[in-house]
Amino acid sequence: RRILGRLPPAAPPSLPQRPPAPPLYDPAELAGLIPADPRQPLPMRALLARIVDGSELDEFKANFGTTLITVRRAPRAQFGSQFRRDSCNYVEPSPSPMQGFARVHGYEVGIVANDGILFSESAVKGAHFVQLCAQRGVPLLFMQNITGFMVGKQYEHEGIAKHGAKLVNAVATANVPKLTVVVGGSFGAGNYGMCGRAYSPRFMWMWPNARIGIMGGEQAGGVLADVRAAQAKRQGTEFADADYAALKERMRERFDAEADPVFATARLWDDGIIEPTQTRAQIALGLATAANAPVEPTRFGVFRM
């Protein structure tokens, strides 16, 4: 290892770096921003203000597709300690995916963050932003708290499948370094659209409160119990209410257990569980590692129009 450490680098670092600046807000407050109930939204902008350099966030298309956040430069007062979740003064805006530019330890990153369901407008905005970062050679940081893409007849008529495919296409084919942090839920196709393990992020970490799976335990239990009840009805067999409740509870317990981050990490579905306060340092380490490899040009596939 010492001999190899003396070898010169193959090429200069591929990612430019400026002098780093600490966040204006204490990263130690991150754990206090996590809700006790995982069904409650995370204050994503407040989380990012405790991770990025100088708490400076330049948001992309802030008023379009508001369920996907693209970062903006925010005034100090917006993210001050008076807005901590454990304070009665804290008011969280509606769930919104977010994209935009910031720096972490001097490295520029394009941040794609969400807090809820992806709609058609959110997916289109996300695809646009990912393409922009790929063209500029800017690394992508995905902050996941996603329950999936919106479903229903109205949203299907509006093209959620087509527009969601644009986001998935852009994420899959962007060759810039991609890092993913699961700070909340990571469920269904939203895991793919937000650069889950199958989409080859350089690193993927999970917070201790994170959950990952095809769907939540409560939803999975209800769906599987409904399927079993419908099957029994077609076959003309009995499926009592007690059997329905027992199957629903059994499936809920199983899905909840397998959604635990320890279950995922034990199977190498990610690169480890990290403390929220260590998120900035882990991202910086991932970016420094990625800077040692050349950034290949991106060749996007065919986007559905």
What are the functions of these language-model segments?
Residues 1-305:
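Ligand-binding clefts of soluble mixed alpha/beta catalytic domains
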